[in-house]
């Protein structure tokens, strides 16, 4: 008897389910994607016990005939591709025909579907992949799929499920991503009878962002767009002042499909340059329209990994789209909001709430650049759980707390902003410059700086030898003197480093530099990089280099320490990129040679520093991404002293401090 046998269909489906159905959120993803492919405009997701007990997806799509409903439970039966050539021009979200049979093989599944309104429909009941019941029923147009007792026949998989709160967080994250990918579809998510998420389905992406991340977040998103012969990019990214501690808020879409791609994520950060603090990430929703021939989605069972042709060109297109859009905005952070961030840290724990978007209650007016709402249509805010700055472990508590507390806040609530103070304190550490990983992150942001329009400032005072005070047409400005000079010196060194033609000064007494044998050998291999920045070291004896001339931008008294610093930097950097090395060197030198805190400046020096800052391409952030200055407007001052009162009915002031 042959040792090799053909597996039964049920067993094969259960094996496939191990790849396709990792957790309840995987079921939600596959079924909702099928509903979207069916042309649905309204999709309702109902779950109980975070999907382990029940998942029900109801849509108003085109539905299925009785014959198609039966075939849908067979492996590799699909209506989305018919030939080999179709595999290379896929525009649907699903195409393999694996999801439904895989899910049915590990659950009790009920399908109720009809192709026309008021006509006869089909009811199918399957258990463990076997159809146990089929009958004709009356059903509205569309499909309702009920999945119960998930993993009932694969108990080993249940052992690896996390808490109900964690599984719910994964479901909400999937629904949020799909809502952003398809703002033209109205999504409703209900857990244990409570409405968790609701989008309007108007097709306005910014409105979908407001429904998912909150109105205050949507107001701080800016639109981007760019295109070439192969790609068309559109979407929204957050202002540099609105960031998160991880990449979970970056949503990349290709032809309506949510994907994960490290290089494209990196291109988003490159578009911000040094405007982002190190360790902080923007909120971004970027939709990429591409010829299906240039994207291969048949890579991974979840279809979230996509191979893209001309990926480098796409990265450049995304970076330039973001940098061009940021040029149009005033990037000086509002000081009053910064104060609110630190004063509300204890309030900043609950997961963000949002409005239930009931068309046409909330809409975005592009001409006025603001949201407007009809008071009669505002419902109570609903809890909206997203994986906000949390690992899987910490999400559990936040979701649990939010479920227990419910959503009882009124629409005129002031939303607490998220705190970035911890990241700022980290930047001040001098140990920071010794970290190769941190340096690499910095350089990725500093490759391109954009010119800016800087306000005219009139200096009038200094506090604690650290902060400069100035006034202008925009109100009061407070400047961090160390960050300001660091920015000035960075741009100076960034420009001067590498200008080797006719810019070398002979040393009357050459310098000798000794290194360990291993460092000496490494430096010899990378000597061309030092020469590119104007440092010409020659071997001179055992493990020793001699320097006979130095670049004129480096003062002679700084040569010895400066060259050692450059060599240390070169030894720290494994990549042999001249561009990156010059940027790293400029960061290091600007930080070490800038005035520190508790250093008193006279009026002339302070005014000169502000004049130099105004000439910078990016005067708003130091090379590490920290803000150089903050602004109190006249209105902010009047609010603090209660000279004017907030308009409690104004939607524009919602969430403002």
Swiss-Prot record:
SUPFAM superfamilies: ATPase domain of HSP90 chaperone/DNA topoisomerase II/histidine kinase, DNA mismatch repair protein MutL, Ribosomal protein S5 domain 2-like. Keywords: DNA damage, DNA repair. GO terms for biological process: mismatch repair. Transmembrane segments: none annotated. It comes from the Bacteria. CDD domains: HATPase_MutL-MLH-PMS-like, MutL_Trans. Disulfide bonds: none annotated. It holds the Pfam family HATPase_c_3. GO terms for molecular function: ATP binding; ATP hydrolysis activity; ATP-dependent DNA damage sensor activity; mismatched DNA binding. GO terms for cellular component: mismatch repair complex. Signal peptide: none annotated. The keyword Protease does not apply. HAMAP family: DNA_mis_repair. This protein is involved in the repair of mismatches in DNA. It is required for dam-dependent methyl-directed DNA mismatch repair. May act as a 'molecular matchmaker', a protein that promotes the formation of a stable complex between two or more DNA-binding proteins in an ATP-dependent manner without itself being part of a final effector complex. Belongs to the DNA mismatch repair MutL/HexB family. NCBIfam families: mutl, PRK00095.1-3. This is DNA mismatch repair protein MutL. It comes from Streptococcus agalactiae serotype Ia (strain ATCC 27591 / A909 / CDC SS700). The gene is mutL.
């Amino acid at each position: 008897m042959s040792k090799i046998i053909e597996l039964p269909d049920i067993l094969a489906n259960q094996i496939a389910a191990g790849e396709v159905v990792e957790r309840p959120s995987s079921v939600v993803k596959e079924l909702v994607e099928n509903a979207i492919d069916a042309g649905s405009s309204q999709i309702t997701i109902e779950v109980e016990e975070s999907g382990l007990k029940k998942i029900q997806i109801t849509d108003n799509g085109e539905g299925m005939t009785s014959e198609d409903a039966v075939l849908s439970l067979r492996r590799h039966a699909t209506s989305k591709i018919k030939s080999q050539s179709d595999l290379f021009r896929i525009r649907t979200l699903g195409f393999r025909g694996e999801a439904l049979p895989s899910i049915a093989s590990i659950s009790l599944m009920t399908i109720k579907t009809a192709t026309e309104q008021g006509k006869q429909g089909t009811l199918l009941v399957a258990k463990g992949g076997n159809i146990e019941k089929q009958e004709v029923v009356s059903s509205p147009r569309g499909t309702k799929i009920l999945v119960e007792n998930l993993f009932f026949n694969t108990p080993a998989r249940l052992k690896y499920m996390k808490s109900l709160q964690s599984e719910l967080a994964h479901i909400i994250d999937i629904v949020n991503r799909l809502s952003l990918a398809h703002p033209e579809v109205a999504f409703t998510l209900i857990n244990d009878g409570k409405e968790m998420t609701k989008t309007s389905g108007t097709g306005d992406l910014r409105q979908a962002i407001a429904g998912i991340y909150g109105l205050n977040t949507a107001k701080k998103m800016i639109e981007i767009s760019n295109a070439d012969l192969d790609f068309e990019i559109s979407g929204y990214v957050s202002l540099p002042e609105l960031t998160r501690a991880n990449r979970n808020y970056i949503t990349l879409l290709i032809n309506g499909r949510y994907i994960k791609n490290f290089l494209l994520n990196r291109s988003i950060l490159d578009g911000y340059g040094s405007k982002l603090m190190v360790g902080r990430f923007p909120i971004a929703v970027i939709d990429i329209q591409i010829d299906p021939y240039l994207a291969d989605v048949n890579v991974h069972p979840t279809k979230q990994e996509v191979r893209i042709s001309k990926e480098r060109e796409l990265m450049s297109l995304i970076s330039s789209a973001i940098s061009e859009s940021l040029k149009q905005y005033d990037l000086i952070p509002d000081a009053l909001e910064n104060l609110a961030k630190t004063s509300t840290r204890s309030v900043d724990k609950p997961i963000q709430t949002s409005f239930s978007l009931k068309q046409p209650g909330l809409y975005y007016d592009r001409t006025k650049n603001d949201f407007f709402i009809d008071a009669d249509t505002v419902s109570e805010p609903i809890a909206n759980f997203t994986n906000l700055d949390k690992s899987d472990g910490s999400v559990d508590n936040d979701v649990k707390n939010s479920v227990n507390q419910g959503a009882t806040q009124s629409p005129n609530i002031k939303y607490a902003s998220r705190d970035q103070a911890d990241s700022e304190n980290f930047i001040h550490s001098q140990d920071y410059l010794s970290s190769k990983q941190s340096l690499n992150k910095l350089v990725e942001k500093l490759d391109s700086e954009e010119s800016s329009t800087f306000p005219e400032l009139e200096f009038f005072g200094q506090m604690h030898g650290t902060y400069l005070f100035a006034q202008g047409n925009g109100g009061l400005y407070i400047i961090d003197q160390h960050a300001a000079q660091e920015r000035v010196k960075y741009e100076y060194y960034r420009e001067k480093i590498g200008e080797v033609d006719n810019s070398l000064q002979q040393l009357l007494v050459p310098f000798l530099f000794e290194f360990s044998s291993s460092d000496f050998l490494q430096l010899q291999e990378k000597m061309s990089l030092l020469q590119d920045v104007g440092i010409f070291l020659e071997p001179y004896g055992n493990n020793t280099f001699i320097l006979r001339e130095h670049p004129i931008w480096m003062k002679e008294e700084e040569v010895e320490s400066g060259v050692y610093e450059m060599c240390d930097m070169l030894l720290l950097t494994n990549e042999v990129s001249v561009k990156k090395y010059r940027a790293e060197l400029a960061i290091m030198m600007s930080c070490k040679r800038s005035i520190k805190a508790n250093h008193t400046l006279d009026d002339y020096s302070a005014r000169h520093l502000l004049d130099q800052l105004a000439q910078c391409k990016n005067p708003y952030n130091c090379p590490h991404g920290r803000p150089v200055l903050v602004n109190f407007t006249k209105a902010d001052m009047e609010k603090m002293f209660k000279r004017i009162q907030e308009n409690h009915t104004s939607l524009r002031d919602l969430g403002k401090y």
